[in-house]
Amino acid sequence: SDEPSEEHKADYLKAKAVVEPYLPGCILRDALSSYDYYTEGLVKHPVVATNHITPFIENDVPDLWAYTCCGQCVDVGNRFLAMPSNRNRILGVQMWKYHITGFLHWGYNFWNSQLSKAVIDPFQVTDAGGAFPGGDGFSVYPGENGPLPSLRQKVFAMALYDMRALSLAEEKLGRESVLKLLGDGESLSLIHI
């Protein structure tokens, strides 16, 4: 699914009932912002937009994943071309602080216009033909021998290294000590970067 809301509930449940029997033992994750979908048991493994994740964090949802896409453009981290790299790199620290175990970004190599009506050259057209913020649809560029990593992808890899380093520091020093090193982490909210 992609961000089901209250009005989509019946259709969501029908679609889930069709797919779920064919995926025994698989973890099904759904991109959503509605905390009600989780509390009502409709979604067991939410992947939440970072600008809507607060109630999930406040209620200690286990195995919580986060995501960004075109809607996360104000006051939160993301990986758009027009954003400074610190808005990308902070994501790893925030994921560690809030026990977020996974991250989804939909656009790895979407080198098309919106709805895939035309192929684009991402070196020339970065916004899917005006549909999304520049860079939202892709993290890599097409290369002769495979994908070419973008600076944004490399910075995000560093964010994940930061997350792992903080986890290791937590094992060695304890969580409170690491938070203290980060200035108690008060300014590391997932909103208001």
Task: Place the predicted regions along the sequence by residue.
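Intervening/peripheral non-core polypeptide segments
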Residues: 42, 191-193
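Catalytic-core regions of glycoside hydrolase
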Residues: 1-116
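Catalytic domains of carbohydrate-active enzymes that cleave complex glycans
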Residues: 1-12, 16-33, 116-191
